[in-house]
Amino acid sequence: MNKKLLRIILTAILLAGAWLVEHYAGLAMWQVLLVYLIPYLLIGYDVLSEAVEGIMDLDPFDEDFLMALATIGALLIGFLPGAEPQFVEAVFVMLFFQLGELFEDYAEDKARDSITELMDIRPDTANIERNGRIEAVSPEEVSVGDIVTVKPGEKIPLDGTILEGTSSLNTVALTGESLPRDVQEGDAVISGCVNLSGVLRLRVDKSYSQSTAAKIIQLVEDAGNNKSRSESFIRRFARVYTPIVVISALALALIPPFFYDSYAPAFATWLYRALTFLVVSCPCALVISIPLTFFAGIGGASHKGILIKGGNYMDALARLKTIVFDKTGTLTHGTFEVEAVHPDNCSEQELLHLAAHVERYSSHPIALALRQAYPHEADNCSIEDVHETAGQGVSAMVNGRVVSVGNDKMMKTLGLSIPVCSRCKNHVGTIVHVAINGVYAGHILISDKLKADAREAISSLKTLGVTRTVMLTGDKKDAARQVAAETGVTDYHAELLPADKVARVEQLLSDKNENGTLAFVGDGINDAPVLARADVGIAMGALGSDAAIEAADVILMDDKPSKISLAIRLSRRTIFIAKENAWFAISIKVAVLLLATCGFASMGLAVFADVGVMVLAVLNAMRAR
């Protein structure tokens, strides 16, 4: 059983026993005090210890000091002339304060569940191959270059590359995406994913501390250090508020009795009101519930594949009015695909076959798109005399035929005219031309595909009150215009260098409303300067990207732009709950403070205004998970 809960139960029993002794044993008041000190010290020794430690450190003003002062005063007030003993209330107040602390601990544990569950992505062991045997060791003991084996049902222990095997990986703990990811030999995999089917042999590419799982866990744990404006204000407020409360309580106890005929009896009455005032004034509900709300909100977002580096970035997300998108890799997939094949005097299959073989050894993204469209490399074709002309294309001898694959410039160099193609009229991607033995043979259309949820993402942002969506790209104006039209962004700027993007963001920052914030959304790899300059830097598709995790303030672990609106909604909900708690706690406390000052509030009501309000506020904070 929880030690604090056991103390609460024993104290309640001893308190009942002390009450019976007080009423039926006929003891003197000082003897009754000694009886009540047993349950009081049992339940309050740690609070008293913290209060004394604060005094010794010359920093006494906290909730422990307020509770110690109020309850000690309640224990002693009965010895004043004309005062009623308040032994039961003194122990009762401390008992309920500890009950509130117990509930706070429980709520914090529940809020940490999101983080604890996130810890489940951390593998316990790695099966490393050593001297022809497999040994289970701690992931921290594995070095870069070691070979590890991952069986079905096990977690990927460290980031690496598959040497052997095919499988499906469950990435839900990292991305929030339930659809498994298929992997095969040569694919890069990251730690924290669960291997669902086949046995995999991996070459370790990163040490444990540099692997994705460890970095994500560290990021979420560190998020608590970046306080929101509300959290920072509450902490500053509490440091000023508590001394003012103590001084006000002293004034309430000492000054009003001067206006009575007899000071001593009046002092006992006003001292009780001052002690009640102290109990009500304890700022627990504010100091505990508001940071807990943000902690729960950050933990809940992490379960949806959204890593927010602190409450301050939740503040900024909630006030977004301008969002600037990079185009490639953010609104589009960032990978070229063959869209259509338009042959001239040959079949589509033959044209694609020849182009793919000519580009077999090129590392250009367009060459990769052609090879992916025709993956049958091992078809016994003879490829000789490969020659690449910078800025034009590639030529090679394929099965005895000279095949040239490139742009308009290459065709002009060959002295070939390019026929007008009516089907290419509205195409804004790349057109790759093919010539065979000096004769024009057709062209292949290649483009970067728009993400499926890009339009929905922009529409959702407008619904949430984002008034300006801007797209920046280094691509050509025609391509930018088409993506802007298809997604619905309000403005776009094309043919920009990285420095131009920073300048555009600077201009947008100077133009924005003071109450609104600006976010830049990119891939986190090539956009670090812009991500750093924006009020909020959002990196998309950051799974496995160290650069993205370091550069951004908010990290979307998959590549869905629609998750930006989800991040905004979660942030706004978290802040709304924090404000709810603040206003609820303040309004109840002000009401009971007035009642206490006028003599209409007992310590029992004061306990509710403190512990009861804290419990309700903490329960409300848990909604942010």
Kindly give the residue locations of the regions a language model identified.
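N-terminal membrane topogenic signal
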Residues: 1-10, 241
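Bilayer-spanning, highly hydrophobic alpha-helical transmembrane segments
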Residues: 12-13, 232-261, 274-294, 579-608
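Membrane-embedded alpha-helical bundles of multi-pass transporters
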Residues: 17-27, 50-59, 73-83, 300, ...
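Actuator/coupling domain of P-type ATPases
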Residues: 19-22, 36-125, 129, 133, ...
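Residue-level signature of catalytic and energy-coupling elements of molecular machines
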Residues: 51, 86, 107, 126, ...
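Conserved catalytic phosphorylation-site environment of P-type ATPases
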Residues: 56, 63-68, 174, 272, ...
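P-type ATPase nucleotide-binding
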Residues: 338-468, 477, 486-505
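Conserved ATP-binding TGD loop and adjacent catalytic N/P-domain core of P-type ATPases
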Residues: 400, 430, 436-580
